[in-house]
């Protein structure tokens, strides 16, 4: 009388002889498909390995499991500076991102015409790297791949814009600071400027933090460490409080990835820190200095915010 949902992690690799066979993985997925168990997938795109024709083949292979397989995301490989002795991967560049987006958007049209949903999605990072406009909200199929960094920025924009439309605005005086990763910085800057149109006396200092701990190629806020945050914000104007996204901390803890704590940051920077939940309404409320009654809908993921 109920349909069981089970999460499986199936690695599909076919570019190295000493790792799992893609045929074996597809056979396992075939069993899930025949059992009617819903699936969602992720492809980590590595330039020169599984892009181009290989990406087309992957999408085609996984697409035959539709509609039981509901979606797949394509995300760029994340490379830290700690790669001595590892396979010589290179980071995804602008041209790589452009090609991947073009491929994925062609496939989206095919799947939408056949099934009524887009199935394959490029992560937000591809659009930022390519310098392209984010897809419209409808193309995210209800944000089914949100936890893999697909649609986070679009959802944030939509939620903040909705909160802005519902706000009356006033002349309250307030000075705050916001720290984030380099990837979401321009979007948060634009949204903050929008908020300040109705609250012109709110002054916001916005700081994109460079990730020296893991490497400058890591640009998401969820992998920023306490030492990078403190080192780059020390001596900067921070106002009456510093806003940090919840995903900058370990889940359920006030601890950064490098074991520094919220209290360490407050003590070093001499400013109260407000950990902001994930939704656009939470962000809006934090900027204007309001707390909303009841629980807010929040989501967490390290990829973007």
Please describe what each predicted stretch is.
Residues 1-19:
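Single conserved hydrophobic/aromatic residue that forms the stacking wall/gate
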Residues 16-24, 29:
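Divalent-metal (Mg2+/Mn2+/Ca2+)-assisted nucleotide/phosphate chemistry catalytic cores
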Residues 16-17, 53-55, 83-88, 132-135:
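Short acidic, glycine/serine/threonine-rich loops at helix termini
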Residues 58, 87-93, 135-138, 258-260:
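Short secondary-structure boundary/capping segments
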Residues 130-305:
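Radical SAM enzyme core and accessory elements
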């Amino acid at each position: 009388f109920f349909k069981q949902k089970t999460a499986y992690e199936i690695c599909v690799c076919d570019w190295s002889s000493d790792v799992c066979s893609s045929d074996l993985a597809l056979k396992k997925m075939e069993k899930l498909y025949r059992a009617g168990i819903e699936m969602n997938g992720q492809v980590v795109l590595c330039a020169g390995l599984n892009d181009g024709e290989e990406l087309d083949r992957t999408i085609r292979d996984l697409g035959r499991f539709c509609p039981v397989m509901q979606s797949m995301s394509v995300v760029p490989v994340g490379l830290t500076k700690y790669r001595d002795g590892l396979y010589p991967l290179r980071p995804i560049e602008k041209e790589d991102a452009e090609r991947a987006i073009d491929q994925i958007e062609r496939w989206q049209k095919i799947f939408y015409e056949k099934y009524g949903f887009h199935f394959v999605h490029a992560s937000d990072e591809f659009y930022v790297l390519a310098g392209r406009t984010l897809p419209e909200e409808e193309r995210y199929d209800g944000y089914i791949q949100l936890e893999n960094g697909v649609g986070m920025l679009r959802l944030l924009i939509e939620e903040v814009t909705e909160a802005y439309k519902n706000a009356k605005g006033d002349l309250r005086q307030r000075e705050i600071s916001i720290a984030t990763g380099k990837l979401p910085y321009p979007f948060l800057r634009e949204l903050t400027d929008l908020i300040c149109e109705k609250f012109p006396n709110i002054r916001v200092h916005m700081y994109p933090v460079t990730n020296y701990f893991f490497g400058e190629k890591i640009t998401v806020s969820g992998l920023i460490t306490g030492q990078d945050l403190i080192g780059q914000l020390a001596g900067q104007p921070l106002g009456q409080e510093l806003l940090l996204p919840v995903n900058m901390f370990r889940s359920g803890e006030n601890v950064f990835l490098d074991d520094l704590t919220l209290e360490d940051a407050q003590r070093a920077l001499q400013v109260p820190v407000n950990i902001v939940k994930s939704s656009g309404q939470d962000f809006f409320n934090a900027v204007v200095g309001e707390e909303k009654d009841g629980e807010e809908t929040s989501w967490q993921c390290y990829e973007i915010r």
